Amino acid sequence: MQSSYFKNGILPIINRFYTKQIHFVGIGGIGMCGLAMLLLAQGYCITGSDIAQNDMIRSLLKLGIKIFFGHRDSNINQEINIVVISSAIDINNPEVQQAKRLKIPVIHRVKILSELMRYKYGIAIAGTHGKTTTVSMLTNIYVEAGLDPTFVNGGIIRSQGVSARLGYGNDFIAESDESDKSFLRLCPVVAVITNIDTDHMNTYHQNFEYLQEVFIKFLDKLPMYGYAVVCIDDPVVRKILPRINRKIITYGFSKDATLCIVKYYQYREKSNFTILIKNNKELQVVLNTPGYHNALNAAASIAVAIEEGIRDTVILKSMSNFTGTNRRFEFLGNYPLNIINGRVGKVMVIDDYGHHPAELRSTIIAIRTGWSDHRLVMVFQPHRFTRTHELYDNFVRVLSTVDVLLMLDIYSAGEQPIMGINAQSLCDSILKYAKVQPIFVQNECFLLKFLMNLLRDKDLLLIQGAGTISEIVKALFIKR
């Protein structure tokens, strides 16, 4: 099936005469889905494999891409010219091994992303948290301005219906990946740094100073005519500012920011705030996305848009029309309790991808600010043994701030278990730390039973995590 996003184009690192079919191992991954869409749009035959369905997989299936479920050497044949992997794919993956036996080149996804960006005006969004939403907001502005950008995002932008699209315009907006240092291979003109926090520390040899050095190196790669947009509220970003040798635009709630957020107010999911710009201009922003963290994401995208000459009216219209990103504080609906436990009333369900303590904290604060009259019930699935181990105490503190906590076992994401690090031990630590009494749901089949007993009218049910948690809980509500 030919993609409706087809544009005449050629990826320079792939010879179109010899290359017809490209296979993605782990095609449903955050960084893989979008690239598959872009290459499909350029006329390549795309296939892929993954272990389970998710929103990304479903969007690819709608485009006619053939996807195998499960990783097997039989998925790879000699008709495939290139196999694409990410850092999440083990070298011993049967498809990778079969490709090597058949002498099929195996390349990392970032090689394709960097080559695509090299031929356009690249805008790379980097940082530990907030990248996906910032890409979504900035893309929304560019589309509203009629600039038809190419974009690659880590989540489906609801207003666009996809996570990536090949545009006719000159601009390329991309989410970059610091988890494996692959963002150092990108060649943007503009770089946004939302924050720098402890995550993926195995990549950085458990050395936070090294992580900071890599971010500085990323900014040093900007051309002399390029610029960096950075969040000055973040203490680590503020610390490295003197070492950035490019034009800098700062944003945040801090009074010394180039774009300063003031008069922030939130009611339910809507937030209002003013952005003061150092040339004495003011922008009154209305955003249909809650949370201080999303005001910061909006300020980052607004900073780029202003610098690129996009009109204020376009920016503000785009902000007020912004409908969000899948699994980023996604409002799934108000569901009658009788579909779960036969009781009278409704429960509001929100789905969120956040899996780092800082992200959980931001989401909880947004809920407490906008829905202080609701009981907060969280179903949380920890993501990765290494992250849970490295940030254990932070998880204990932030998870202790909800009213009711149900915890599934850790989603490994392919990692080997770490002795003593599991959901049960995390629940035990939370119980010792706070009044909340966490419930460890050892088998996801029992989740419905627990929810039947716990949920009551006006509860806010928060589905939290980056693993399979969203699919599990959606099945309880949406498919019933």
From Swiss-Prot:
Pathway assigned in UniProt: Cell wall biogenesis; peptidoglycan biosynthesis
Signal peptide: none
Annotated catalysed reactions: UDP-N-acetyl-alpha-D-muramate + L-alanine + ATP = UDP-N-acetyl-alpha-D-muramoyl-L-alanine + ADP + phosphate + H(+)
Pfam families from the UniProt entry: Mur_ligase, Mur_ligase_C, Mur_ligase_M
Annotated binding of ATP, by residue: G127, T128, H129, G130, K131, T132, T133
UniProt entry tagged with the keyword Nucleotide-binding: yes
Main location: cytoplasm
EC number in record: 6.3.2.8
Job of this protein: Cell wall formation.
UniProt record similarity statement: Belongs to the MurCDEF family.
Protein name: UDP-N-acetylmuramate--L-alanine ligase
Organism: Blochmanniella floridana
Primary gene name: murC
